[in-house]
Amino acid sequence: MLGIWTLLPLVLTSVVRLLSKCVNAQVTDISSKGFELRKIVTTIETQNLEGLHHEGQFCRNPCPPGERKARDCTVNEDEPDCVPCQEGKEYTDKGHFSSKCRRCRLCDEGHGLEVEINCTRTQNTKCRCKPNFFCNSAVCEHCDPCTKCEHGIIEECTLTSNTKCKEEDSRSDLPWLCLLLLLIPPIVYVVIKKACRKHRKENQGPHESTTLNPETAINLSDVDLSKYITTIAGAMTLSQVKDFVRKNGVSEAKIDEIKNDNVQDTAEQKVQLLRNWYQLHGKKDACDTLIKGLKTADLCTLAEKIHAVILKDITSDTENSNFRNEIQSLV
């Protein structure tokens, strides 16, 4: 009898454990079924938002594309009362149970779009990019303007790709550029040479156009320029005088000294600068140095004028001297 009372608690514990397992299994099964039910309900609700399933009473068939349900079915499995969508403004492209049509899409010109296919009751509007616009995405909500090329086009703009432009420093122009750079120096040289020759001819006096015979030939290398300094200074600007004397030995300190001594008289500055140069250089070859220096500074016209003045004066003196000599020989 004592053994029975000892085994009874063990039996009761085993029974409780078995009952607990059964209850847990049922709860788990119920939870799993509840989850599946919620999933089905969610799917139905989502589809109802698209109008693919029944609203209100269950109609037997959906409204065809291009129409909508005018009113709910009053009896389950009844045929729906469908009416057409508004042409050009609304559409439905599949069978449905909804009482509303979808609104047609608008092609916004401000976003570079235009209508490719108009909206019908069974098809939404189809948009495309306007001319000179493109869109390279799968769904085009807007189009971008095509790039305008300044230096030539490699590929034209299309509806799905932008223009491909040539670069500014295209290598195709390099040979022409090199040829141009090679031709410029000789052309400039010829132009300058012709200009100097033209000025020389325009300023040449009648006495210069004839060739002097050995008896009347004049050597300008030993001409005394002191009496021509004022005339030469009057034919030149102050900057021209400064450039000439600076390149021919007059120091900057001396140039500044002459400037400070004659601040208000630029004419006197030119005369003093040329006198100072002449004193430094000396009489011999001074005339040739002056003429060559002016030509080197691209002052061909000025050089020819000074040369003509000196030559005319010397020629006149020579003729007078010859005339006097002839008179004396006759006496």
Curated annotation (Swiss-Prot):
TNFR-Cys repeats lie at residues 47-83, 84-127, 128-166. One of its GO terms (biological process) is negative regulation of apoptotic process. It is a single-pass type I membrane protein. It comes from the Eukaryota. Palmitoylated. Palmitoylation by ZDHHC7 prevents the lysosomal degradation of FAS regulating its expression at the plasma membrane. GO terms for cellular component: CD95 death-inducing signaling complex; external side of plasma membrane; membrane raft. Residues 209-313 are annotated as: Interaction with HIPK3. Residues 226-310 form the Death domain. GO terms for molecular function: calmodulin binding; tumor necrosis factor receptor activity. Its main location: membrane. It holds the Pfam family Death. Keywords: Apoptosis, Calmodulin-binding, Cell membrane, Disulfide bond, Glycoprotein, Lipoprotein, Membrane, Palmitate, Phosphoprotein, Receptor, Repeat, Signal, Transmembrane, Transmembrane helix. Residues 1-25 form the signal peptide. This is Tumor necrosis factor receptor superfamily member 6. It comes from Macaca fascicularis (Crab-eating macaque). The gene is FAS.
